[in-house]
Amino acid sequence: LTAHVAPISLDFEEGIDRKTLRRLRDRFLLVNQQRWDRAHSALSYRQQMVLEVLPLVFHLNHPALPGYLDSDCPYGLSNYKPSPATINAARRLARTFSLKDEGKRKPDLDAMFLMGSPGTLGHSVASDLDVWLCHRRDLPERGIGCLERKAAKLTRWAESFGVELHVFVFCASDWRAGRQRAEVTGENCGSAQHFLLLDEFYRTSIHLAGAWPMWWLIPPEQEANYDDCMRKLVDFRFVRAEDYIDFGPVPTIPEEEFLGAGVWQLYKGIDAPWKSILKLLLIECYARTTGEPLLSSEFKRAVFRGETDADSLDPYVMLYGRLEGWLAGPEVASRLDLIRRSLYLKAGLPLTRSEVSGEQWRARLLRQMVTRWGWSECILAELDERQRWRAEDVVTLRRTIVNELTHGYRLLSKMAREHGQRAAISANDINLLGRKLYAAFQRKAGKIEQINPGLAPSLAEENLAFHHQSEQGGDSDGWLLYRDLEDPADAFWQPVIRRSGNLAELMVWCYCNGLLTRSTRLNVRSGTSIASVSELREMLDALSAFLPFPVPPAEREALSRGVRPLRNLLLVNVGVDPQAHLTEKGLHKLSSRHDSLGFSGGRENLVISIDQITFNSWHEVSLQHYAAGDTLIQCLKNVLASVAANPAELPGVQVHCHNRGHGSAIARRVQELFADVLRPFFAGGTGPHPLRYVIEMDRRYFLLQFNGLEPGFVALESFEALMEYLAMPQERYLPVVFDRYALQEEPALRAVCLASEPDNIQVFYRILGDQARLWVVDELGSLFSWEQAVTSRRHLLVPVLRFLDNLIERRLLRHTDSAGVVAGVQCYEIVRRDGTWRAEYRPESDSGVPLPGFEVQAVGIHEGDSRLRFDIFCGDQEFSVQEYGDQLIPAVAHYIRSLRQSDEVYPVYLTDIHLPHDLDPRVYQQDIQTSQYLYYRSVLEDSLNRHLARTR
């Protein structure tokens, strides 16, 4: 082929002729044919058939050809006549195929192009085929939809031939108007870029069939007058309009497009960095050199000038030349070196190997370039041995790549802001792309960094050694990762792959980055820990079942929503013996208690440490280590917090514990606990629901509840402290839910809380000989309890019911307009029937029984020091704080004692209490909770009865 021919000049003012236009068209077609031949030769025999028959399957709607849907699907490519090679390829696919004359039917399709890297230096075996299929502008929506379904079917067919095919269906006039149908997907830039994509199309596309680009015929110096020139060519019939397709000019790239295009290249760069680095730097180059012509213009200028050599016009050669000229100077040498490495690795052609001879033109061209760069054979060998790259190599390279990608994004974002332009990318698309970038590159606490985004084929190691730092002396508590360390003594001289504060993080990092596989040999030097190879093997099995490798990218739908946890894996007691302190004493089990959170007679909590691994909807993997304080409760609190924002879909919780003897029991108990806690808080896929969840663990009680969307917990050191806390006032009704193992020695209390209801005052009692236990659950779920002597079953509830009746009567007087808001009283007896504790309803028949004696009332008052004191009325006799001061209680006790006719000691019961509305000095309480009245009643009664006993 002739590389240089005479230049062509078109002067639209002086006049043009059809013969010159045909020569110009044929010159572009000559370059086009060279690229098609190169693209064809790079494919395998089976893959070549896909490229050969692609125009034919859209030109004909033949049922024997791939992609056929139905007889109504649009078909026919303008001015297309299949070659003998194409017909033969079709017959190889379908023996019944025969070419029929369609007559003069108007074709539905204008043109078909292949664009991107095929036929270029950058094409590799992994490259895909991006096809533009352009339909006529008046095609109905139903026909367009049919073409899109046919394209999708062809994509699946091509996949069976080892070809990744993407066919984009659109109309040229819609393209010019910016009405693209597609959104951002894996292979579509959506709204992110228009002119940049058109610039790439004009300099890389291969015409497959149909109309030719009108852009070919417009001189590069006339790009600004594109529309006028195009109209002259058509109106004066220099060309037939149906022979050409018009995508419009690319005089320059609008500034507002740079941000969208930059974000898009970052999106692509997550999985294919080499190509994206080149494109991102080209975008930056365009943005910084706005006065210089675009590469598409340079390509067209070269063809007009007479250049037809495919090497010189290769899009990647031209791209590199532009970037090399722009990045001149020692201060940017590192960026230029990254560009060269990216181009070499994008080509995927290892020059140090003999088998590249089948890629003669690419090998020759690439060899010329690396020779010009002054690369040594050592550099080539390093790049050609990508499959032998280690984690350390990839980490360094990834850092360089991420720095370059983020540098480009920040620069473009800054430029877009400075020019005050709206980015040429929809808000939805930029949000979507930003989320993917965040998920891939953003560092945050606990996140497991993915170090190999398509940089090396594999980082798998044959042998990994995990060494506890105490093995090397000192009291350090971290872990070191080595490779091929057969002799532990060599650790002092071997490089460390990675250091970590805990073993689980090191294991998860190795697994997620592919260093650790089932075939990797493991070595453990545990030092002061008890980790073992068997524990690591079990951990690897748990990780493999929990998380796929490699971690796939998140789907568009997931990125369009807020991030949420999908599932959690809890690794319990990694490298820890939870019974070490018991074993030292020769103790293993001192009672029949099997609960792992209150094990044996010592009520030992066997959960010492937890490593929580979370896999979220953006496909980020993170690890949180809990080893100090109340580890299980802290972990539970964090899981609850992560669910609160999206309770409709509860994350899965898997638990693994290796510990010999009790490992499976510990894992089962922890898994039960998480399920039991999540269920009531988020029942029905909503929540968090208002409740208080009580867990008994390690001889203590933990009470979990939400404040809005924030979970919190209170640790209580004793049963008495728990009961005091449950009696405290609430802002709204909060029922008490007990964990399945909590307070098993208090079945009556569990039955009380199970029977509690909102907007009621419930009195529960249980008689035990001459003593009774009473509980009152008030209108907001606060629980108050006390013991009382039983002198008569009939009179047992009378004092408290009389007290509550007086309280309710006073509330009714205040709420005359809304009597329904005042809670009534219901009574229940706690009984055991058929081995089950339950609350049985008892009518309030005793409330009207008269009691001997007189009314004892207390009226609370606040003095200057804000201490709450009480004036007490015994019948008509008043005992005031002002008169009696600290001697008020003894005086009342003495008075009551003086009125009794016998020496028998029996308790005094208050019949009513008035509390001030400023009981809490910080707020004004319109309605004081029943539990608060019961508390002060109990305090006063206890004090009075103690003094009565003394005055005997």
Residue ranges of each PLM-predicted region?
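Catalytic metal-binding acidic patch
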Residues: F113, T120-L147, E164-V169
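Short, conserved secondary-structure transition motifs
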Residues: V163-T185
